[in-house]
Amino acid sequence: MAKKTDKGSGVNSTAIEQVSTASLIPYARNARTHSETQVKQIAGSIQEFGFCNPVLVDATNGIIAGHGRVMAAQLLKLETVPCLRLSHLTDAQKRAYVLADNRIALSSGWDEEMLANELSDLHADEFDMALLGFDADELTALLSMEDTAEAI
């Protein structure tokens, strides 16, 4: 049985620090994959919005969450990225969080009507829709759903 830490301890540091991309160590057993297309999407997002979501690392710069963001940063030739150090986690908790962080996000869904409204408004604002991560067919379907709702 894995040793547990105090569940109420939370993050023991909320300080975001800039860490050299060259010093970050990908988790060798990371089960999540990142296609070249997705890494380019993440890079586009970083260019448009900035690096808004820090990479989560352990005490030795091992990546716990943010492998795709680091790959995108390397593509953009960024020398440093914002990191949040999670030195309070046990080895088992780090391995589990690598999985949980990716899997739990997949359990969410979309309010398709609200999504269609937001996409329609962004489209009307002439925002670059390619930065949102939806493929062309998805955008067409969702925008036509909004057009249909407006016609009713």
Predicted regions and their residues:
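Aromatic/glycine/proline-enriched transmembrane-helix motif characteristic
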Residues: 1-152
